[in-house]
């Protein structure tokens, strides 16, 4: 009836509790409904005509008071004198005279039914209702509200993850760090023989969407071992102590399935630092302590590897990160340009692409995008192709998908007045022209005044020619000038300002503040850090590390940076007013201008800039080709190393098989020799027996001859 003995135990316990509650309820109910009175009180009530009816039932008399009695609404009972052998023939007469209804019942006929109705049926009902409730709670709470020690980990069999390193792109360094773990799980013997121990745990750290969970599954897929997957929040649910019990159960199962991988996603849910704060969570700390104990207790040579993922490594407890636990930290950061292109290739493997599609251009247009973003872009492009009735995805679909992710869908039904449209056009061209005429800015890719659903009335898209990991002070100032170029154009052309620059002002202010408070680009504060960035992988807000007075001075410095950048933008646009008007006219006519067309207009006035830009492009392309060649060389080296490891493993396996075969043959030969010797011994023994038997027969024959000759002699005499 019950597959889970623990569940049966809990239902029995709760049934006993329910029985006690039911017993108490029945006792209280009897106390409330029934009241015992003396027989003399009953007689007095009868004389006062305060009795409505009487029922003689076994050893007691049940009395129902009349409406005039003070005890109205209760059922009274008193002892029946007949039980003691005392008869009162006058009682029946008095009841008849008083007009009181009376009746005689046999209680034994109703005892069984009363017992069933009062006790058995309610208990059965409670039992089955409780069973159904616990069953539903089990299903809803992933293993059960009553399964205290059971973990909720999803167990993937050896080939069920379906993911290998081929499905992970743009994270070559992370994959390289994990190849060692895969090799260890493939063949733990060679590590044990040399005395090497693999790290017990590896912590995957990086922003959301970079592929930390995918990497963990790829490790399991490559190693072809069982894969336990569990979220940190799954350890703690509603009962104190459940988290620690689940940790114990998880590691117990892992040791039984070894070699295997245990993956804990979002481990910061249980691994937060125990800082002694008053608002500490005892249940979470118990779970963390149990996890630390288990990681100390198991032997990594058995082949159990713990992988965990988080995007908040700064909040993790130091004991969790010390050597012997999660002592290897693998950074899974945002992919670079080549990485983004490789990711796009992976996600577009099953998508029909046109021959003219350039994934490199899409990779260039998505700086800072993670794997999840790029997968979404490819899917959006495929959906757009289907929407337009095409059988394959073209470049336009991918370009539009990028813009949908960045700015939202086109909002063609939003009609702007001619004046507003003109303001938006000058605003966007102001951004683009300042970007084109400054030296430390990214090239303009597109200018549009088509409104978008995310609120933009138009936008200017800039795409970097190369990946930048360092930004100079001059570059940051020029970037701020570009941000303020739209407002500057409004001032130069219309001599007024609008609300359209709100987002530009916000971003410019944040960049200027970072220059002063974080990057040490202020002459007044030199290299003093006034703010610190928290949660770097989650785009956390800066935390101020200075006094109110210093913060006020820093605000003045920020204002000066913004003012200088603003003045630079205004100066550029005033000097190039004719170019500003010309490009704006083209934009108003076409609504969208691509970067090449825009730059051709600019090159018409500044031909020397064309040569400089082309030279810079060639240098960047050369560097990119070198980087790509190095990456391919590195990938080939890793591939060869893995193939060599597999070859050696195969050779070792064949040698082991050959050795086992030789040993088996030697054992068989030994057994054969033993059998031959045994057969020879048996044959020799048989020959000896035959010789003995022959000698015995010969002796018997001689005796017969002697007896015969003796008899002949006797007869002759």
UniProtKB/Swiss-Prot annotation:
GO CC annotation terms, alphabetical: plasma membrane
GO annotation (BP), single: proteolysis
UniProt cofactor(s): Zn(2+)
Residues annotated as binding ATP: 206-213
MF term (GO), any: ATP hydrolysis activity
Enzymatic class: hydrolase
Cytoplasmic topological segments: 1-7, 131-717
PROSITE patterns per UniProt: AAA (PS00674)
Location of region: Disordered: 670-717
Cofactor binding note: Binds 1 zinc ion per subunit.
UniProt-listed SUPFAM superfamilies: FtsH protease domain-like, P-loop containing nucleoside triphosphate hydrolases
Entry membrane topology: Multi-pass membrane protein
Any single Pfam family the record assigns to this protein: AAA
Regions that span the bilayer: 8-28, 110-130
Positions annotated as active site in the UniProt record: 428
Amino acids binding Zn(2+): 427, 431, 504
EC number(s) given by UniProt: 3.4.24.-
Main location: membrane
Localization: Cell membrane
Function: Acts as a processive, ATP-dependent zinc metallopeptidase for both cytoplasmic and membrane proteins. Plays a role in the quality control of integral membrane proteins.
Subunit composition and interactions: Homohexamer.
Family per similarity comment: In the central section; belongs to the AAA ATPase family. In the C-terminal section; belongs to the peptidase M41 family.
Protein name listed in UniProt: ATP-dependent zinc metalloprotease FtsH
């Amino acid at each position: 009836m019950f597959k889970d003995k623990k569940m049966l135990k809990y239902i029995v316990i709760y049934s006993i509790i329910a029985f006690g509650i039911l017993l108490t309820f029945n006792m209280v109910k009897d106390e409330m409904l029934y009241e015992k009175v003396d027989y003399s009180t009953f007689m007095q009530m009868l004389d006062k005509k305060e009795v409505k009816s009487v029922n003689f039932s076994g050893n007691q008399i049940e009395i129902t008071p009349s409406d005039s009695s003070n005890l109205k609404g209760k059922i009274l009972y008193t002892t029946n004198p007949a039980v003691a052998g005392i008869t009162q023939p006058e009682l029946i007469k008095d009841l008849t005279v008083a007009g009181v209804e009376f009746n005689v019942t046999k209680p034994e006929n109703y005892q069984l039914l009363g017992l069933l109705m009062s006790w058995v049926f309610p208990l059965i009902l409670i039992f089955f209702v409780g069973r159904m409730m616990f069953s539903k709670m089990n299903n809803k709470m992933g293993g059960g509200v009553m399964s205290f020690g059971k973990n909720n980990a999803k167990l993937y069999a050896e080939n069920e993850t379906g993911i290998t390193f081929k499905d992970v792109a743009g994270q070559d360094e992370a994959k390289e760090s994990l190849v060692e773990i895969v090799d260890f799980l493939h063949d733990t013997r060679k590590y044990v023989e040399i005395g090497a121990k693999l790290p017990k745990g590896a912590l995957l750290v990086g922003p959301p969407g970079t592929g930390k969970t995918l990497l963990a599954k790829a490790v399991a897929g490559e190693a072809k071992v069982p894969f336990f997957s569990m979220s940190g929040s799954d350890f703690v649910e509603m009962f104190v102590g459940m988290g620690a019990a689940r940790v114990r159960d998880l590691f117990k199962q892992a040791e039984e399935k070894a070699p295997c991988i245990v993956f804990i996603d979002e481990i910061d849910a249980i691994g937060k630092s125990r800082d002694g704060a008053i608002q500490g969570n005892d249940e979470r700390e118990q779970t963390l302590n149990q996890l630390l104990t288990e990681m100390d207790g198991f032997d990594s040579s058995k082949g159990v590897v713990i992988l965990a993922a988080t995007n908040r490594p700064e909040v993790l407890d130091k004991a969790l990160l010390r050597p012997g636990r999660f002592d290897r930290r693998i950074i899974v950061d945002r992919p670079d340009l080549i990485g983004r292109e490789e990711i796009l290739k992976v996600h577009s493997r099953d998508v029909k692409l046109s021959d003219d599609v350039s994934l490199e251009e899409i990779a260039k247009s998505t700086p800072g995008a993670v794997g999840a973003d790029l997968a979404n872009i490819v899917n959006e492009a495929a959906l757009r192709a289907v929407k337009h009735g095409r059988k394959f995805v073209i470049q336009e679909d991918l370009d539009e998908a990028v813009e949908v992710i960045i700015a939202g869908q086109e909002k063609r039904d939003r009609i702007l007045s001619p004046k507003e449209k003109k303001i938006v056009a000058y605003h966007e061209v102001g951004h683009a022209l300042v970007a084109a005429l400054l030296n430390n800015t990214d090239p303009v890719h597109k200018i549009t005044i088509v409104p978008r659903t995310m609120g933009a009335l138009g936008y200017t898209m800039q795409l970097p020619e190369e990946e930048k990991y360092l930004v100079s002070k001059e570059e940051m100032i020029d970037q701020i000038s570009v941000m303020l170029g739209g407002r500057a154009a409004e001032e130069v052309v219309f001599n007024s300002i609008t609300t359209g620059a709100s987002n530009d002002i916000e971003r410019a202010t944040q960049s200027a503040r970072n220059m002063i408070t974080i990057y040490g680009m202020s002459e007044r504060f030199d290299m003093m850090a006034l703010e610190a960035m928290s949660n770097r992988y989650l785009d956390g807000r800066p935390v101020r590390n200075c006094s109110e007075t210093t913060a006020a001075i820093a605000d003045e410095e920020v204002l000066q940076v913004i003012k200088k950048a603003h003045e630079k933008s205004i100066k550029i646009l005033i000097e190039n007013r004719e170019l500003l008007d010309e490009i704006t006219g083209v934009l108003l006519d076409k609504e969208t201008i691509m970067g090449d067309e825009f730059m051709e207009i600019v090159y018409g006035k500044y031909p020397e800039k064309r040569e400089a830009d082309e030279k810079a492009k060639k240098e960047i392309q050369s560097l990119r080709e070198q980087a790509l060649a190095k990456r391919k060389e590195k990938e080939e080296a890793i591939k060869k190393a893995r193939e060599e490891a597999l070859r050696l493993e195969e050779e070792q396996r064949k040698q082991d098989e050959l050795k086992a075969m030789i040993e088996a043959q030697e054992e068989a030969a030994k057994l054969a020799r033993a059998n031959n010797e045994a057969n020879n011994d048996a044959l020799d023994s048989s020959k000896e027996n035959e010789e003995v038997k022959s000698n015995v027969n010969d002796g018997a024959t001689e005796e017969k001859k002697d007896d015969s000759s003796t008899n002949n002699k006797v007869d002759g005499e």
